[in-house]
Amino acid sequence: MRILFIHQNFPGQFKHLAAALAKRGHEVKALAITPRAELPGVQVMKYAVPGKNGPSTHPWLLDLETKTIRAEHCARKLLELQRCGYTPDVVVGHPGWGETLLVKDVWPEAAFLAFLELFYREDSLFDPEFAVRSFEQAARIRMKNAAFLVTLDAMDWGLSPTSWQAAHFPPEHRERISVIFDGVDTAAVRPAKDAWIHLEKKQKRLSRENEVITFVNRNLEPYRGYHRFMRALPRILELRPNAEVVLVGGDGVSYGAPCPNGTWKETFLNEVKDRLDLSRVHFVGRVPYPLFLNLLQISSCHVYLTVPFVLSWSLIEAMSAGCVVVGSRTAPVMEVVEDGKNGLLVDFFDTDELTSRVVEVLSSRERFASLGLAARRTVEQHYALSKCLPKQLELVESMPKRRKTSPSTRAL
């Protein structure tokens, strides 16, 4: 079959899937704005988005206009391919940035599989500390979903990584959404007793012999519970005088609102730094993937906190590495972590409970080691690439049969 992937930063979530389809003999192409990697057997094409938002655009429509601009330029590239005689059998695309809005208008006969990562809800209201409820906010969120609603109407089938994510899409579309996780390479992300890292700034070498608390996010921000973790740290370090804390993440914002003054990282560090032994707190920023894996492999306790939002890959990777996870008792985490079985869960807002759980794990590492082993088994059984990739391949290869009998009217 001819299969076309569309992702602004290809390969993104499609790294293993696209390469595997090419290996199986399919003709695989990909379209991106800024490709991040080359894959064997996959022809990657680029397109440009020169347009920008107009000066008089209604603020509630800025997101939709941005996505429409991307959709236009992506569609023009698709039309160019069409004029050259190319028509895919299957299009697999991430609609989150708008590129796929007009796919079915260019190729109504192609089967369109949409990667459905997030349907916007008022998750910002979860944490009262940052909740700002207003009619304007609700209207903005509703309008942000406008592009997704167009995609849901046009797609032949959807793919979501978790049940929690799939359940957030409108009920009338859920029967056309398959839940298959992206997949973690458990052969690469695995426990390693001899792992170690070197912290250059403070000239420290850490291994599994040390008490190491890990906290990982793309950016250190409230959506991922950074403020809750920082407020627990002074007491944790007081009770565990030999513990070292390593925080991975940038200073920016991936989700939610930006910090009104400076960065969230500095704001919540400043709140507690007078009560911290900063010689044992290590902010390492964003790190190369091999170093990230080594860090997970030496972790004595991995803390993962999040509001009800898309689950981070890093949690599944931590479990695959055999970490003892202390996670927030929020729905996305509870889909993966079962309290007392393959990790520990705490109330997102309860600083004392978080503190006591982390201290308990560090105080009795041998007793809690079984949770890390169980976490690894959970990933091997349900989230491993070896389990997920065959299901993804089967879904893509079945897409011509899943095409809706009445494709949308061609508009271009």
List PLM regions with ranges.
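Conserved acidic donor-binding segment of nucleotide-sugar-dependent glycosyltransferases
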Residues: 339-340, 344-351, 360-365
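A short, well-ordered alpha-helix in the C-terminal region of glycosyltransferases
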Residues: 353, 360, 367-382, 388-394
